Amino acid sequence: MSFNHQEIEKKWQGYWEENKTFRTPDETEKPKFYALDMFPYPSGAGLHVGHPEGYTATDILSRMKRMQGYNVLHPMGWDAFGLPAEQYALDTGNSPAEFTEHNINTFRNQIKSLGFSYDWDREVNTTDPNYYKWTQWIFLKLFEKGLAYVDEVPVNWCPALGTVLANEEIIDGKSERGGHPVERRPMRQWMLKITAYGDRLLEDLDELDWPESLKDMQRNWIGRSEGAEVHFNIDGTDEKFTVFTTRPDTLFGASYCVLAPEHALVADITTADQKEAVEAYINSVKMKSDLERTELAKEKTGVFTGAYAVNPVNGEKLPIWIADYVLATYGTGAVMAVPAHDERDYEFASTFNLPMKEVVKGGDITKEAYTGDGAHVNSAFLDGLNKEEAIAKMIEWLEVTSAGNQKVTYRLRDWLFSRQRYWGEPIPVIHWEDGTMTAVKEEELPLVLPKTENIRPSGTGESPLANIDEWVNVVDPETGKKGRRETNTMPQWAGSCWYYLRYIDPNNSEALVDPEKVKQWLPVDIYIGGAEHAVLHLLYARFWHKVLYDIGVVPTKEPFQQLFNQGMILGENNEKMSKSKGNVVNPDDIVASHGADTLRLYEMFMGPLDASIAWSENGLDGARRFLDRVWRLFVQDNGELSEKITDAPNKDLEKAYHQTVKKVTEDYAELRFNTAISQMMVFINDAYKAETLPKEYVEGFVKMIAPVAPHIGEELWSKLGYNETITYASWPTFDESKLVEDEVEIVVQVMGKVRAKLTMSKDASKDEMEKLALEAIQDQIEGKTVRKVIVVPGKLVNVVAN
């Protein structure tokens, strides 16, 4: 008989809720363990089968750690601001707040139906004013430290929609919604100076237990480059511009310069006869995204400004071009071009027939750029030096002559922090009529997002908040000065940058987090989520954490000690699940048909946690069959405990049991859930063959399977006679001495060929081994004379006979 999953799951979920089984106490002598999931965005589509994969992994760890005597913090919450809710509100006229609340309730019910051991008293929601009060407080601290500033930044402006679009909302230069043209235009935006933390974000990666591939992604994103800044005067004017180069040693080989089309100097230096061509080119670039502009494979385009720069090292005049592959937002927005020794410059020079000058020996510049090392030539005081020596000498020359200086730059850009949206945290800043701006006072936080029926875009590029006059317009009560509130809102990243801190102290109205509690719980011991957040979310969260460390709010330099990315669950056809393909599997259906325990077991047994694997109905059925086998082994058809279970020991199962405890304990800790489950299956096979089942082993097994299948775990535990939940029962231990093999397999050879295999005591003497071996191969050596017997204790017997 199989078990009734609907009955059992409802019963134990009710028990856990009523008894607050998973409530995490703050004061405790126990060691701590903080297991964190990347909290979900509560979309209208609800939970899909990909969500529970990571959640089950942290839940297994949390449940094991509780049984091992740890005080476990395992929370859940909602990353609930964001574009889809605003889009829904625009399309339907409903409120994004109501939509979000409805979705959260759906998600919460779905998650509870899967039996995760979350402490729901610590639930957070980024759209709750009591939560975003502290998101705004962190912004004030960034503002005070000079890390939040206003800048003119090119954004994706869609005139037809009257709004700024995120890169993700644009497809082939047109708005995803309505297919309207999109152009780049500068707009006043809030920026966060993440670049000020570039070195620390890079160096501290070394101390983290993260996958190396993920650390490399962050290193590349930060993109630290050492080199020099070089100042170029513009011929015939007082103007100058600066370039950054990692190869100052090739300055003698510079043959032209390129400015970004948006560079502030372009309008001033363009000559009258080039003006028309330059303006036409600038207009054509407005439609392109940064990604399109910098694509390596694309055809090089550009136009000559008519102006010349002066090479500081030799006085040569270099033509100044503009080209879209140089971005105003990257570096200085200007580059010196050395086509003989840089691939991109070589392509551009070849396209526009610009001169090339070899300054490093070793290649053939008639065929391609030479980017390797070699002796310098045509370079005056650098001639004969290698790359490293020449770089050092050129930097020295630049600094002595004030023509430049040593410089470290980052690929990392400052973080564009404002959004022209309604559904986000208001930025707590007021712009006064005299041109000054001040932050909202701390005691006035939270600055609450006003309710409004009209969340249509303002049409001016400002957010819909600009339409709410009574909210936007303010008067200083002391001076009578008039002002306007900042109408931009924060991006969705803001609330997710620090949520792991709020779980530690979710109801504190006086502080972001209590200093004693944060000292107790940080760092997060394990953080599991999707690889799509490998760069931005993790980088932003690390940045905010370091700022909070600098102002004494948190005691650790890093938030997340260990990080793991789960793989993706694909459709049965190995394609990504999506509504359009009709291959999405809804966990609610599986919970109804097979049970939550089966879904949890199946997702952990599919393969390694970090692999992307196709969903399989057969695999799901197999997981259910295994749980049924476990149930039938321990429970009779009448619901009573099996009569095979006794208090007497059973030597036959001893080794298998201790092996299972060892392997499951180690594999759970290392997130190798699929191999832990395999080992439990092996044990169940052995247990079916056994005459009797020692109660100690049955209890140990139930404790091991409970983290994966908690409902069946609780039900079996109560059938074993326990009135208390299994949650805090002590984890089983193993005895190493019981794992040692008493018997070994001996190979028997005749004239070097294997003729038999024997099992015997590992302590058998040479004589005993020889005697047993000769008996086993009697028919092989009949009529032959045994000349010699070679015995290797514990391994083999080789008989020489002819």
From Swiss-Prot:
Compartments (UniProt record): Cytoplasm
EC number(s) recorded for this UniProt protein: 6.1.1.4
Chain ranges for the short sequence motif 'HIGH' region as given in the UniProt record: 40-51
GO biological process, one term: leucyl-tRNA aminoacylation
GO cellular component: cytosol
Top-level taxonomic group: Bacteria
Keywords (A to Z) from UniProt: Aminoacyl-tRNA synthetase, ATP-binding, Cytoplasm, Ligase, Nucleotide-binding, Protein biosynthesis
Short name of any one Pfam family annotated for the protein: tRNA-synt_1g
Keyword Calcium among record annotations: no
One Gene Ontology MF term: leucine-tRNA ligase activity
Catalysed reaction, written as an equation: tRNA(Leu) + L-leucine + ATP = L-leucyl-tRNA(Leu) + AMP + diphosphate
Amino-acid positions noted as binding ATP in the UniProt annotation, renumbered to this chain: 579
Motif 'KMSKS' region: where in chain: 576-580
Keyword set includes Iron: no
Family: Belongs to the class-I aminoacyl-tRNA synthetase family.
HAMAP family: Leu_tRNA_synth_B
Annotated protein name in UniProt: Leucine--tRNA ligase
